[in-house]
């Protein structure tokens, strides 16, 4: 019973904090054209409730489940997902640029030729691996929560990028899918 109460509380906090974070980030992009230090902290912290919720959903993975084909696939996907995320973030070179505060030019090389949000794709692959490794029926909820969060964040970031880069960004959007797919 206590686990369900904690899970419900974490889920509710995830929804409230994510909604507030998206509102705050959108507001900062519109008012200042970038994120302030507080907006940057909130942007990063926005993913923590999902990670906590995911840990609760899978029961707090303290040890690996018995090795099986599924466990091996899950571990491989977690490693691959983190690798993709870190590789994609490397193209920004600085934390300030990653948060959208340093905008010398549109990043369109590397993994950004195939996805406008490869860091979200990588992080999503990590969570698929996590959920395969520590499968419970609730993992579907965790994945749906992640998809909803990154879709909303991508929409907020795209509004900002359209204002900053104009037609160059719109052309990029026409060539490259938001998350997955082949470039046009």
Residues of each region from the PLM?
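Loop-to-transmembrane-helix entry motif
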Residues: 115-121, 179
């Amino acid at each position: 019973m206590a686990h369900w109460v904690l899970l419900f509380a974490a889920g509710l906090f995830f929804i409230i904090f994510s909604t507030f974070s998206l509102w705050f980030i959108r507001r900062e992009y519109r008012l200042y054209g970038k994120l302030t230090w507080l907006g940057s902290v909130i942007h990063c912290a926005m993913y923590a409730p999902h990670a906590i919720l995911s840990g609760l959903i899978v029961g707090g993975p303290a040890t690996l489940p018995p090795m099986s084909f599924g466990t091996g696939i899950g571990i491989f996907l977690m490693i691959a997902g983190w690798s993709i995320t870190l590789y994609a973030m490397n193209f920004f070179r600085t934390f300030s640029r990653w948060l959208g505060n340093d905008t010398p030019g549109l990043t369109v090389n590397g993994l950004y030729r195939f996805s406008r949000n490869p860091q979200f794709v990588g992080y999503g692959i990590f969570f698929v691996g996590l959920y395969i490794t520590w499968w419970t029926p609730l993992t579907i909820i965790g994945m749906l929560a992640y998809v909803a969060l990154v879709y909303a964040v991508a929409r907020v970031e795209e509004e900002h990028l359209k204002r900053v880069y104009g037609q160059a960004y719109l052309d990029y959007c026409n060539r490259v899918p938001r998350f997955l797919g082949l470039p046009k």
